[in-house]
Amino acid sequence: MNFAEAMREQARLQALRALASAPDYTAADTVLQRVLQADGVAVAMSSLRIELSWLNEQGFVVTQRPGGATGVTIAT
């Protein structure tokens, strides 16, 4: 595993942890980006959206894009 791959995995894990503690297990991607940065995982919005799409494809989250920001909810 190279460094970039490790950082992508860390971003996905931190996003899931943030959602697990969010009200209704839901947050906007902009909020997730700030939480990740506060946890020391600096990620560009475009990169975060790619990782959120990956989590969606794997069935871990459900993403919705009503208007600009992407809403993310842990899949149940």
Predicted regions and their residues:
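Short, cationic-aromatic polyanion-contact patches
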Residues: 66-76
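Short acidic, hydrophobic short linear motifs in intrinsically disordered regions
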Residues: 25-36
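Short alpha-helical segments that sit at the start of domains
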Residues: 1-26, 42
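A short, conserved structural fragment
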Residues: 56-66
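A short glycine/small-residue-enriched secondary-structure motif
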Residues: 32, 51-55, 69
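Carbohydrate-binding/catalytic loop surfaces
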Residues: 39
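Short amphipathic alpha-helical interaction segments
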Residues: 42-57
